[in-house]
Amino acid sequence: MSNNMNIDQTDQNTIDEGLYSRQLYVLGHEAMKQMSQSNVLIIGCKGLGVEIAKNVCLAGVKSVTLYDPQPTRIEDLSSQYFLTEDDIGVPRAKVTVSKLAELNQYVPVSVVDELSTEYLKNFKCVVVTETSLTKQLEINDFTHKNHIAYIAADSRGLFGSIFCDFGENFICTDTDGNEPLTGMIASITDDGVVTMLEETRHGLENGDFVKFTEVKGMPGLNDGTPRKVEVKGPYTFSIGSVKDLGSAGYNGVFTQVKVPTKISFKSLRESLKDPEYVYPDFGKMMRPPQYHIAFQALSAFADAHEGSLPRPRNDIDAAEFFEFCKKIASTLQFDVELDEKLIKEISYQARGDLVAMSAFLGGAVAQEVLKATTSKFYPLKQYFYFDSLESLPSSVTISEETCKPRGCRYDGQIAVFGSEFQEKIASLSTFLVGAGAIGCEMLKNWAMMGVATGESGHISVTDMDSIEKSNLNRQFLFRPRDVGKLKSECASTAVSIMNPSLTGKITSYQERVGPESEGIFGDEFFEKLSLVTNALDNVEARMYVDRRCVFFEKPLLESGTLGTKGNTQVVVPHLTESYGSSQDPPEKSFPICTLKNFPNRIEHTIAWARDLFEGLFKQPIDNVNMYLSSPNFLETSLKTSSNPREVLENIRDYLVTEKPLSFEECIMWARLQFDKFFNNNIQQLLFNFPKDSVTSTGQPFWSGPKRAPTPLSFDIHNREHFDFIVAAASLYAFNYGLKSETDPAIYERVLAGYNPPPFAPKSGIKIQVNENEEAPETAANKDKQELKSIADSLPPPSSLVGFRLTPAEFEKDDDSNHHIDFITAASNLRAMNYDITPADRFKTKFVAGKIVPAMCTSTAVVSGLVCLELVKLVDGKKKIEEYKNGFFNLAIGLFTFSDPIASPKMKVNGKEIDKIWDRYNLPDCTLQELIDYFQKEEGLEVTMLSSGVSLLYANFQPPKKLAERLPLKISELVEQITKKKLEPFRKHLVLEICCDDANGEDVEVPFICIKL
């Protein structure tokens, strides 16, 4: 037995937030600490085993130990990306260990040469792949008895299985991973009936538990005790009698409490006889029992043939395998009518080893490992069987001859798809947009599949970003030495090492995909592509790529993740709708008046603090620099700015009245800001609306969501107060290029004896109470004489030649720049003003930075599903039901698959037209010829024609203008109207057209594509 490195090392006390930040927002600190104390054993280092190990290492367990003494074979390279042809004959675990160890410096990886059941006691979780059922039973008998989590997984061609046994008394602390529900309450009766504020839905279910904070009239209810919920309606629920706490409560906040749940698992031996299934596809509800028998039969077949599985497409082996299945079904006394065709397909594919299946199953299994080690999220209970038979090609001959081994690295894939289909995969020309988490996984999968390795194949990948430390947790092609380098270049290099046949076959770009890069990703570029794959993190770019794919009639593979959730979509020309056909609802935003004057949630104060950061350290600096560098800046601002007064005052303050000459002056400036925002403005608000104010209807003004604030008096010994001064002074110094200090003694010395001027409330100050009122700034901007007076007081730019300020460009992941420090301090001070529970730096960073929670497990699952759809596109499948859009939530073991939505059709003069994919293809004719074509050939009268924002033709235009335009070619007309020459790379023009039919009725028609 080789050295088991650091299995018993001391627990990690601290978590590297810089590395794990995106994952921490999914799991939380407590779960991460538990994980970092858990040793994991992984048996089997083929494609599925290494995928599980890779994800578990990235996630950050205490240690990973590998067991696989089997020698590397050429066919292993179909899915095992850490093996090379030079490793053939060397034990798989021995080759893999050093590659896995590179993934995460905090996770030692070691190899064990021999396994004994007693040795298993070292581990919190044991994962078994590529292992006979007899051996699995031996291991599980021991793990079940000794409270060690056990997971078994197998990938056989387009079929896969997962089995979980976490013991009879597994405690799950959070069953769904959702943020606890929270809401504002209006009232609580002594019977415990809680009514929500302003008829907002509480979202709770019977049996949920909640706790209360900030409840008035019943202070005893704020003790943090979880209380069981009985739902009365969408806006009311009961917590049982609270008579002993008072007669009535009002205001306050409820927060859902996650209560631990006990889950009991059966052992493998019991589960073989009495299985419990998770159903991933409701269209295949009858298949899990078939697969339950078949996967046992595969092990029995291998036992009878010295470990060999049925040969690809071999009918003799398939017939024998079917007999094994019948025998097992009879022994277990299962009332299942075996589907002979389906069962034999499993035999045909048993030696298949597909990286797409390994990625999908490996991501799902790794998440189960994390559940076992953290007790967070609901486990798969207990059998999960999956197939993607729709991916089996029909465009090529699949036979024993075409699927037999070739002695090449793709033999595991050829065993399923055949050698002819392998050539199709090698000939692909693909475009990957994004080389982040999903992009890395996609490139790895393509390298194993042999995508674009043929003579005519090519991969283009673009990503404008550089690698950051936080990327390393899930973008597994990158290493710490790559931080600062370009993602597209590093990813391309990494996969070319995995599969040397890709050397020279990948072109990496650093351009953002958008209108500005159409000179690079133009007509010629898109016309050569077989398909496009999105690996993007924003909707705008996705929509743009989608439009380009529709225009060039290219298939698009779309996917995304959010924490443990993920989705995939396949877009097929002339068959499915496009990505842009349906859109997510817009992101919720907070009313301005709520943020400015009436916050009631910590999210409100964080958003306010984020705006304050921009308003103090970014926007005014930009205005100053524009004033100093642009001669017409003032004139333009007075005409176009929504708040010209603020722009002018910013320039005056930052150049004259508040310009610091030393860091000490920056400290004093920060102190003034404290009084302004957390004392004076609050006093002014209370002057306008005293705490006993009533509305026009006689109701208390400060009630419901409006909380009466309390001014803060500065105390240098209060940590939040001091943190604000340090962050604000440091950022202000950064703007002016002054050296900042962190020594508290300096701040105490500067601020000693400072007495702020007493606050004097101002009359006539208007405060916006609701969204319907005019913002007070609007009125202030109407005094043109005062605006001119401020403008005249500014120093001329000529007196400050060469002087510039440095704006603070918000960067959430640099802990040394004071950005999150400032926002956290400002948000929490405002929370103190309004009696809102403050948030720590971690939560503040999440909200202010709009961080998208991410897990390497979800990314792996998504990439696997996308590649299963890619195979269908290569095959050219024509039936919409053969494609699948997928959605999953690994936290609750939910997988759903649906047929894509068909592209909508319409009829124009009796002719059926596809609303998305059809277009009128015309040469660069004259405007008159175009109008005549539609009149004669389509029976339509053109009423309007445009290109982008340029109106080319309208039937109501003056006759003189029409006479000038009708003889011009479309390209000439566009150039004349836009006053710009068409770019040389452009081969097409897109025109939007409005038409009437013979009855004068407006008709919806597709766009026109003019070929130049």
UniProtKB/Swiss-Prot annotation:
Pfam families listed in its UniProt record: E1_4HB (PF16191), E1_FCCH (PF16190), E1_UFD (PF09358), ThiF (PF00899), UBA_E1_SCCH (PF10585)
CDD domains from the UniProt entry: Ube1_repeat1, Ube1_repeat2
Resulting phenotype, F689A: Abolishes enzyme activity
Sequence positions that bind Mg(2+) 1: D465, E468
Keyword Disulfide bond: no
Activity modulation: Ubiquitin transfer between the E1 ubiquitin-activating enzyme ptr3 and E2 ubiquitin-conjugating enzyme ubc4 is enhanced by the presence of magnesium and ATP, or adenylated ubiquitin.
Pathway where this protein functions: Protein modification; protein ubiquitination
Biological processes annotated in GO: DNA damage response; protein ubiquitination; ubiquitin-dependent protein catabolic process
Localisation per UniProt entry: Cytoplasm; Nucleus
Effect on the protein of changing F701A: Nearly abolishes enzyme activity. Abolishes enzyme activity
SMART domains reported in the protein's UniProt record: UBA_e1_C
Record cross-link Glycyl lysine isopeptide (Lys-Gly) (interchain with G-Cter in ubiquitin), residues: K588
Domain of life: Eukaryota
Modified residues (Phosphoserine): S264, S903
Enzyme class label: ligase
EC nos: 6.2.1.45
InterPro entries xref list: E1_4HB, E1_FCCH, E1_FCCH_sf, ThiF/MoeB/HesA, ThiF_NAD_FAD-bd, Ub-activating_enz_E1_C, Ub-E1_IAD_1, UBA_E1_C_sf
GO MF term list: ATP binding; ATP hydrolysis activity; magnesium ion binding; ubiquitin activating enzyme activity
Note: There are two active sites within the E1 molecule, allowing it to accommodate two ubiquitin moieties at a time, with a new ubiquitin forming an adenylate intermediate as the previous one is transferred to the thiol site.
UniProt subunit comment: Monomer. Interacts with the E2 ubiquitin-conjugating enzyme ubc4.
Name of the featured protein: Ubiquitin-activating enzyme E1 1
Provenance organism: Schizosaccharomyces pombe (strain 972 / ATCC 24843)
